[in-house]
């Protein structure tokens, strides 16, 4: 069976990995590089039970458990570890009483904010380095028969008689396929010109990574931050196993560029994050800035993933729209998609809540 996956982010790489476990060596097409967009610039935070009562709950719990299995199966260090996770309040307009809340639980924080709730412990929350994890998945897939090919997809070809995909055109060359999977993150929007897909949008966010002189503990922080204007933000601060600290929290409204290579970085937004880091911790105030980053998270109209077969064209599939939970839900998505493609149905989870045709196609 010839399978082509368009996109070498974490979702496409996970699908390639689980297909390889079934003896199917997919061809992964990527315009830029592995994990070149959000899959290389996310926080890599994982939570098992933060979607309880929502359609994503089954997917999240399956994926969290698969992450544990993958630490042994991939046999490479990508910074996976369990963490404690706290909620913290911080304001530029008012102060909090010293010693309140759970602030003493995280010993590298200043006294300006208040840690007021344990959101998860080492049984329910974890963290990894997103780019290294994505590369580990794709490397394992390629070792088992998959291949990565750099190029720009120009069209998806269909056999009108059989009403089935026949392949794709990449940089002017036709590649035949029995199945084609759209896993291009927010750039899956480009595929709406070839297939009846719903609109996929890109939400832009900024992040920085810091290298502190003093190591910090494995405690993730989700902030409720009030700025001088009274606006509320939700920064996330994720220490990594390699000693770096990741911080995100401000968004932008720039339109999605044609290529991930053209994503612009707003240094003003990143510098705001730098100042915020210093408010949270003196250790972070003295840290070296390693990177300023920006990326677009894929999201659709109802903020749910779009995963499954594309109606009307046999052999056409899509897996995108995971928003901020792509790194978490990649293993479950990859496993279910591999089952759907190879066996005709997903047996690990019910994909019905994520069916592409639950939403109207962008192009009628």
Model regions: which residues?
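Predominantly flavin-linked oxidoreductase catalytic cores and closely associated redox partners
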Residues: 128-216
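C-terminal catalytic lobe of FAD-dependent flavoproteins
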Residues: 281-364
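Residue-level detector of alpha-helix initiation sites
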Residues: 9-10, 33, 186, 324
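Flavin (FAD/FMN) cofactor-binding and adjacent substrate-gating region
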Residues: 69, 77-150, 155-164
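Conserved FAD-binding subdomain of flavin-dependent enzymes
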Residues: 18-21, 31-85, 94-103, 228-230
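N-terminal Rossmann-like FAD-binding beta1-loop-alpha1 element of flavoenzymes
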Residues: 2-27
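Active-site substrate-recognition segment that forms the wall
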Residues: 17-21, 44-46, 78-81, 179, ...
């Amino acid at each position: 069976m010839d399978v082509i996956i368009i996109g070498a982010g974490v979702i496409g790489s996970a699908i390639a990995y689980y297909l390889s476990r079934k003896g199917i060596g997919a061809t992964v097409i990527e315009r830029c590089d592995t994990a070149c967009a959000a899959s290389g610039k996310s926080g890599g935070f994982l939570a098992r039970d933060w979607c309880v009562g929502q359609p994503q709950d089954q997917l999240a719990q399956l994926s969290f458990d698969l992450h544990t299995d993958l630490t042994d199966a991939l046999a490479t260090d990508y910074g996976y570890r369990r963490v404690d996770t706290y909620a913290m309040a911080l304001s530029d307009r008012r102060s909090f009483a010293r010693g309140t809340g759970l602030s003493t639980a995280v010993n590298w924080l200043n006294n300006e904010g208040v840690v007021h709730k344990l959101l998860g412990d080492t049984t329910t929350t974890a963290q990894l380095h997103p780019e290294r994890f994505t590369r580990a998945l794709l490397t394992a897939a390629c070792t088992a028969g998959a291949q990565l090919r750099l190029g720009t997809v120009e069209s998806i070809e269909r056999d009108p008689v059989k009403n089935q995909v026949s392949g794709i055109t990449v940089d002017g060359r036709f590649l035949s396929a029995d199945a084609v999977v759209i896993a291009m993150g927010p750039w899956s929007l480009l595929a709406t010109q070839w297939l009846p897909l719903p609109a996929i949008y890109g939400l832009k966010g900024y992040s920085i990574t810091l290298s502190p002189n003093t190591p910090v503990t494995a405690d993730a922080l989700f902030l409720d931050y009030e700025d001088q204007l009274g606006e509320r933000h939700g920064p996330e601060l994720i220490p990594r196993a390699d000693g770096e600290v990741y911080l995100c929290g401000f968004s932008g409204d720039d339109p999605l560029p044609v290529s991930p290579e053209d994503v612009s970085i707003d240094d003003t937004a990143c510098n705001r994050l730098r100042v915020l880091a210093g408010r949270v911790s003196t250790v972070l105030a003295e840290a070296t800035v390693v990177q300023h980053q920006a990326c677009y998270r894929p999201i659709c109209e109802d903020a749910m993933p779009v995963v499954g077969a594309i109606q009307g064209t046999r052999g056409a599939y899509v897996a995108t729209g995971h928003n901020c939970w792509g790194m978490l839900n990649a293993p479950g998505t990859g496993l279910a998609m591999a089952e759907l493609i190879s066996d005709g149905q997903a047996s690990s989870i019910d994909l019905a809540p994520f069916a592409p045709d639950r939403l109207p196609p962008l192009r009628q």
